[in-house]
Amino acid sequence: SNEVIINRNSFELTAKIIGYNNIYPGHYLLKDGMSNIQLINMLRKGFQTPVKVVFNNIKNLEQLAGRVSDQIEADSLSITTAIRNDSSICPCYFIPNTYEFYWNTDAESFIKKMKAEYEKFWNETRIAKAEEMNLKPEEVSILASIVDKETTKTSEMPRIAGVYLNRLKKHWPLQADPTLIYALGDYSIHRVLDVHKEIDSPYNTYKHAGLPPGPICLPSIAAIDAVLNAERHKYFYFCAKDDLSGYHVFARNINEHNRNAEKYRRALNKHKIYK
């Protein structure tokens, strides 16, 4: 940094005298007023400043690798390869949050740290809540991923989670539209149609009862905790409100739900949202 190293010749001479010949890669915070000796000692001893690695709203592991590789030295290919080569890796291990890493973290070290963070996240309290619902942590994350894609309104998440838990208890298909969009791989869909429900996929929760085989995104902490603290009620259906506010209206039976769904369909037609 030209703001710190005022005299390059002086810095190089000091480095030569001290015997500092190699530059070790990393993320270092250089402070104004540092002497050449202070700077060289910091670089030689590898006193890095951690970088904050942030990821959220992630659809899949490939997107995760791309997002993380923008923030540490490891490239997206090495991260993706390391994940695929580790059979013990579950997408659920990567919980969206803000983490601290050294910039020169490699792919294997990144995965190791994320596993440790996953174990830390799933403390005794969360595990006990999952067990009360007869769900494994991985299953909680799968359901949370659906909840996450159903609503952007955090306040609604526990109620929506409660609907799906009620359906699971009855062994009903979840009939979750976001799982169809995931199966189709078309995230431009704004209106799920009957033809979409015919896709042959284990992620089609209209055809297959129970949870899909994996998460449809990396669920947020808010969604995971919404499942673990789901609202207890007698709702089995929900539909987006016809004011298109992003909120939902809930129903206890199919007749009530059909009336709500018809209002929503009319609203979509009014706004010319056909697909």
Regions inferred by a protein language model and the residue ranges of each:
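Conserved catalytic or metal-liganding residues and their short signature motifs at active sites
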Residues: S1-D186, S201, C217-A222, A226-K234, ...
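C-terminal, helix-dominated tail/subdomain
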Residues: L184-P215
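Active-site-proximal loop/helix segment associated with metal-binding centers of metalloenzymes
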Residues: F238
